[in-house]
Regions:
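Short, solvent-exposed S/T- and G/P-enriched segments that are highly enriched in secreted/extracellular
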Residues: 2-10, 234-239
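Acidic, serine/threonine- and glycine-rich low-complexity intrinsically disordered segments
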Residues: 4-6, 17-22
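A glycine-anchored, Pro-Gly-centered beta-turn/N-cap motif
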Residues: 13-16, 249
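Aromatic, loop-rich ligand-recognition surfaces of beta-strand-rich domains
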Residues: 22-34, 39-92, 101-240, 244-275
Length: 275
């Protein structure tokens, strides 16, 4: 420190967020806005909250999404949720077809028709293994608890029991089913009798860092006095909506129910930009 200026040398410049601060009464107080360093010629980006302009934000994740996670979501495209009253799935009916990249967390699909089947399944498109984390079917009489049945489908990839068909119905989004087949790859349930179905809920294979329905979250932004809370919300679907956050601020979304991974971000052009 010299002439009221602090100089830091031998710093790593590879996409790292730095915050210069000082201790006061047991807290770290920012001495300057946070800085993101990039690999491009030691370029820096600073986050300075603009309190005169407020954002309405739609948030889907609390941590950056790796390319493999996006790839796993895309594996479900053109997948079909089918029903039949024959164990070999003759005369199947498509209850739902995945036509858009699904979110990283659970997606609920309310069916236009009440179907009645004994056998149901998720069938991946040809040439793709049936990698999926969770599959749930619901009846009109119980919208909370998924229907129970005997798992059925292809054997797991490489005979790996950690990816066996039961994993698609265990209620844990961090486990998954992965089929050995690359064609006609599927996993399903035998209900034991014809059963009414009016809702499907499923989750792609992922890292559980997407917004999860039923979990409580808190959004904060970094001010010159430290982190400021914008409130808490319990997720009702795979995204959260917050209003009143200052433009150009550095944000942090925390899951108060489970998980520890989180990463700061700015909100630009209606998108979370990870730091």
């Amino acid at each position: 420190i010299k002439d009221d200026t602090a100089r830091f040398e031998h710093m790593d410049w590879r996409n790292i967020v730095y915050l210069v601060g000082y201790y006061k009464e047991g807290r770290i107080i920012p001495a300057a806005p946070p800085i993101l360093t990039t690999e491009m010629a030691k370029h820096t980006i600073s986050a300075r909250p603009n309190m005169q302009k407020k954002n309405k934000m739609r948030l889907e994740r609390k941590y950056t999404e790796a390319p493999i996670i996006i790839f796993l979501r895309d594996l479900l495209l053109d997948g079909r949720f089918q029903g039949s009253n024959s164990p070999d799935f003759k005369n199947t009916i498509d209850m739902h077809v995945i036509t858009q990249r699904p979110p990283g967390s659970y997606l609920t699909v309310k069916l236009d028709t009440v179907y009645k089947f004994r056998y149901v399944r998720f069938l991946a498109r040809d040439g793709i293994r049936s990698d999926i984390s969770e599959v749930e079917f619901y009846s009109p009489s119980d919208s909370v608890n998924p229907l129970k049945g005997i798992p059925m489908g292809n054997p797991p990839v490489d005979g790996d029991n950690s990816h066996r068909m039961e994993m698609a119905f265990d209620g844990d989004p961090l486990t998954c089913y992965a089929s050995a087949n690359l064609n006609n790859a599927w996993v399903g349930l035998d209900f034991g009798k014809k059963t009414e179905i009016n809702k499907i809920r499923f989750a792609p294979r992922g890292d559980d860092n997407s917004v999860r329905e039923g979990d409580e979250y808190e959004l904060k932004y970094l001010s010159m006095d430290g982190w400021v809370s914008l409130g808490r919300q319990t997720a009702r679907t795979y995204f959260l909506e917050f209003s009143g956050g200052p433009d150009k601020a550095l944000y942090l979304l925390s899951n108060l129910t489970r998980g520890r991974e989180e990463r700061p971000f700015t909100y630009e052009n209606d998108t979370q930009v990870w730091w």
